[in-house]
Amino acid sequence: MIQVLLVTLCLAVFPYQGSSIILESGNVNDYEVVYPRKVTVLPKGAVQPKYEDAMQYEFKVNGEPVVLHLEKNKQLFSKDYSETHYSPDGREITTYPLVEDHCYYHGRIENDADSTASISACNGLKGHFKLQGEMYLIDPLKLPDSEAHAVFKYENVEKEDEAPKMCGVTQNWESYEPIKKASQLNLTPEQQAYLDAKKYVEFVVVLDHGMYTKYKDNLDKIKTRIFEIVNTMNEMFIPLNIRVALICLEIWSDKDKFNMTSAANVTSISFRNWRATDLLKRKSHDNAQLLTVIDFDGPTIGKAYMASMCDPKRSVGIIQDHSTINLMMAVTMAHEMGHNLGMDHDEKYCTCGAKSCVMAKALSRQPSKLFSNCSQEDYRKYLIKRRPKCILNEPNGTDIVSPPVCGNELLEVGEECDCGSPTNCQNPCCDAATCKLTPGSQCADGVCCDQCRFTRAGTECRQAKDDCDMADLCTGQSAECPTDRFQRNGHPCLNDNGYCYNRTCPTLKNQCIYFFGPNAAVAKDSCFKGNQKSNNHTYCRKENGKKIPCAPQDIKCGRLYCFRNLPGKKNICSVIYTPTDEDIGMVLPGTKCEDGKVCSNGHCVDVNIAYKSTTGFSQI
């Protein structure tokens, strides 16, 4: 018989009703003081770690006993998690802190099947829990020698302002290309296997200089807040079979890395470009979000690129630090990542079992951590059509923070498979007790694994997503689909309206639609002649800092000119020009400028010359 030692850290539970108090979460008008009692079951003689893998707290809410069960979120960080900040002279400082024994938990309330919890146990209990359909927040009261905490409903937090808070995304990623509901599609076994596979988003959070100064240069305070927010984000995506793992936190402690502006669209483009040219070269990741103190124009508090997960330029979001309540920030960040994963804004008919769902266009004063049925359908549809590969990349066994454990459904060092506990495992290819393949099995999971055997060579495992993609085939030697292949640069696309360039099909029309909306069109040639003038914003390229006007044959490779086609208004030659980032609004490299020609370094050149190299083709 195993002897256990019950360790009780606080024996008393004294409820107390308060009228008003100021906490980190804001001004609270009605709260209850509780003294949580922690009960930990340990084998006799066992050493108690600083933060146990599982904990249990008891306290009362509205006079009724509550038992809070917590489990450490072992998937919050990757082993190679890093933190980057900058010295006053701009020197990059990157550290790799030990994060295994962290203090961030998910949980539930005993005897409440609909309950959830996201809690930081670093210094008392801080976070939120859902009890009997109501969202409660809990904050430690900073009293000397006291275990007192305040518990209060979210609705009792004094609202910071009454202005609406909205997402800046306006375009449905399939506005012009409707398809059937994902549930109605006839899926191939490979598509179904892809849908069923666990997904992992390797996530980077970047804080601008304003965030650093807002928290009075206190790096520890900033980190704690971000960890609490991402812990909640992680919990929100679990029902979608996604793990959000924080792999890097970057803090611009010296200065902003580009000029910040209140125009969300411009800041989004600037952050996108900085990530592609700087951050990705230093830290491989799937998705990044910028948190800023900038008050975006209008009601906008966030913006992201639709259906862009894994895209080296577009898998980003920008977030305004609009609330002191971590739950509100987590919902906003999850909302923008939802856009990256193909989710549109909810319509009136969308439901999630709460008053508002994550993908509502306006942030509700009663936020929910649930994605609607529409969001889940959008996500499935996006996965089926786009199949973003990076989110299939499970963290390497050596990258997982916790020690290898057979039965946790994570493939770790020394394991051939891991289908969960023997009770829950339903995979006939995997021995749940040993995490080894069953006799005769070649594989247990993967899009090229069928009934425990490698799929026949030549079987399609990844459909072509568009004209510049190529279908990928199983090799017959692996359960995984080979590396994604793409059409060579210069391959015709979009009905010969463009040429493939670095996996995309850039056209003048699509660039006009991006900047000016779905009614926009390419302007007349007479507008583009403005690029022949030598002024501040019309030119073809820069040489040694000098702006070079376009030659007559190159005018469609300089500044982009569009017609907005606004109802009741005369079309004028419209351009986008931002002094803080002059590249915004220029025609993209690889864009078709004439039949058989593309833009290359501000010149309109023959497509075969632009992409020719010793191997036949190269990038511009």
From Swiss-Prot:
What is the tissue specificity? Expressed by the venom gland.
Residues that, per the record, bind Zn(2+): 335, 339, 345
Free-text remark on how the cofactor is bound = Binds 1 zinc ion per subunit.
Question: Which residues are part of the propeptide segment?
Answer: 21-189
| Disulfide partners | 310-390, 350-374, 352-357, 406-435, 417-430, 419-425, 429-452, 443-449, 448-474, 461-481, 468-500, 493-505, 512-562, 527-573, 540-550, 557-599, 593-604
Q: What class of enzyme is it?
A: hydrolase
The source's superkingdom equals Eukaryota
Name where it's found.
Secreted
Reported regulation of activity: Inhibited by EDTA and O-phenanthroline. Not inhibited by PMSF, benzamidine, irreversible serine-proteinase inhibitors and cysteine proteinase inhibitor E-64.
Q: Which SUPFAM superfamilies does this one have?
A: Blood coagulation inhibitor (disintegrin), Metalloproteases ('zincins'), catalytic domain
Q: What is its main location?
A: secreted
Question: Which CDD domains does this UniProt record tie to the protein?
Answer: ZnMc_adamalysin_II_like
Give the active-site positions. Answer: 336
- Listed Pfam families: ADAM_CR, Disintegrin, Pep_M12B_propep, Reprolysin
Family membership noted in the UniProt record: Belongs to the venom metalloproteinase (M12B) family. P-III subfamily. P-IIIa sub-subfamily.
| Listed name of the protein | Zinc metalloproteinase-disintegrin-like ACLD
Question: Where does this protein come from, organism-wise?
Answer: Agkistrodon contortrix laticinctus
